[in-house]
C-alpha cells in the first residue's frame, strides 16, 4: 500500500502520543516487548526533546515496562485506561473514575450477556480483578495459562468472582476501566463487534464505550483519550497542533477527531482508518513525517 503524504507546513511537532497494542507493539515481540526499530525511534524522539506520551487502554504496569525498555525516563508521560488516568513526572495529575456503586451495578447487569468469557476491572490496585465465571473449568484453566504466557505483555491479575465483587465494593478501590472479553481469535473479535451496539444502546448514557479487538471497554461517561491528552498538553505547554497522534482501534478515534496530525496503522479496522489522515505500515514509518 502506498502511503499518503501530508505536509505539516511550519508546525513543529513537539510531542508524539502513541497507542501501545497494535501500534507501538506492532509487530509483537513477546520477549523484547518492542521491535528494535520502534524502540530506537521512541528513544531518539525522547532524546531530541520531544514529549513521548503513551496513550493506552492498559493500566500502568506495561507502560512502566516500556519506559524501562526504552531506557529514557525524561519526557515520557502516560495516559492510561483510555484517558481515565494521566501520569506526568511520576505523578497522577488527572483522573476520572467510575463510582464503585455504579461499577457494581454494571457488573451485575453484564451477567445476562453469556457471550462474555471474562470481565476485567482496571483499578488503582497493582493487580486487575478478573471474573472468569463465564468460562467452564477447563477453559478457565486454559485462560489462566494463556494469561501467564503473554511474555512481556503480561499484566498482574487476581481471579475470582467473589474477589472481584469485594474489590469493587472496597471504598479504597478506584475503578478506571471495566472490560468484558469475548474470547480468543477472530471469533472473539466478531462477537465483541456484534455485542458492541447492544452495549451502547443499553449503557451508552452512563458510560463511554469502545471496542478493542475481542474486548469492549467501559469508562465513565466523558472519559476518553483525547480529553486526557489535552489536559496533559496544557500542563506541558504544548499546543494541540504540535502533537502527532498514532493508534489503531476504536478507542483511538477521539484522538483522530481532535488532533489534526493523526496517523493510523494500516491493519486497523476500516472505520478507524477513515478517521485519520495518514496510514502507516509500521509505527517507525512515522520517521518519514516527523524529524
Walk through the language-model features, giving the residues of each.
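Generic N-terminal amphipathic, Lys/Arg-enriched alpha-helix
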Residues: 20-27
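Mg2+-dependent phosphoryl-transfer enzymes with acidic/Ser/Thr/Gly-rich catalytic loops
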Residues: 12-15, 24, 35, 215-291
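Structural beta-sheet core signal
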Residues: 54, 120-121, 180, 245, ...
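Active-site phosphate-binding/coordination module
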Residues: 36-144
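Non-catalytic pre-domain segments flanking phosphatase-related domains
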Residues: 1-18, 37, 47, 238
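Polybasic, low-complexity association/targeting segments
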Residues: 28-31, 39
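Conserved acidic, metal-coordinating active-site core of Asp-based
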Residues: 123-244
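A general structural motif
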Residues: 13, 49, 75, 173-175, ...
